[in-house]
């Protein structure tokens, strides 16, 4: 919600300049891509833990993933994660492609800044490979 409000205000209040004739929106998007939806959910649990730790006043390095992490959370914690991770997608290539396309359409962003906060380096590289393979590009 806050992102969409910021984009609306930016576009409404934009004043052309020598550097930029029209509004140009860049939006950050978290992607947790893997070969299966289950693996992607597992990988995403590192970021989920990290965000909750930060909210609890206990910041630190990105923790390792935990199987079925969200099953241990309260309804309030799940609501916090839904809000914080509303600019993200997780899943296999088809799921990620759809999530990126939906976010790009919803925001009308001219450019996406994609990140993949995955604990394991090789899994993070695989996530970025999948992101590159799905190749969402604005026409």
Residue ranges and their predicted role:
Residues 104-139:
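Generic C-terminus detector
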Residues 2-108, 136:
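An alpha-helical appendage that flanks or caps ligand/catalytic pockets
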Residues 1, 90, 118, 122:
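Charge-dense, low-complexity intrinsically disordered segments
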């Amino acid at each position: 919600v806050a992102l969409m409000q910021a984009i609306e205000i930016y576009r409404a209040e934009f004043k052309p300049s020598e550097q930029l004739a029209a509004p140009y929106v860049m939006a950050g998007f978290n992607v947790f891509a893997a070969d299966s939806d289950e693996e992607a959910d597992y990988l995403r649990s590192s970021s989920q833990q990290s965000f909750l730790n930060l909210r609890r006043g206990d910041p630190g390095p990105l923790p390792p993933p935990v199987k079925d992490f969200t099953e241990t959370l309260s309804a309030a914690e799940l609501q916090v994660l839904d809000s914080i991770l509303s600019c993200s997608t997780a899943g296999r290539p088809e799921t990620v492609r759809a999530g990126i396309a939906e976010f790009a359409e919803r925001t009308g962003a001219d450019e996406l800044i994609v990140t993949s906060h995955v604990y394991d380096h090789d899994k993070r590289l695989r996530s970025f490979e999948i992101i590159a393979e799905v190749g969402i590009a604005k026409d």
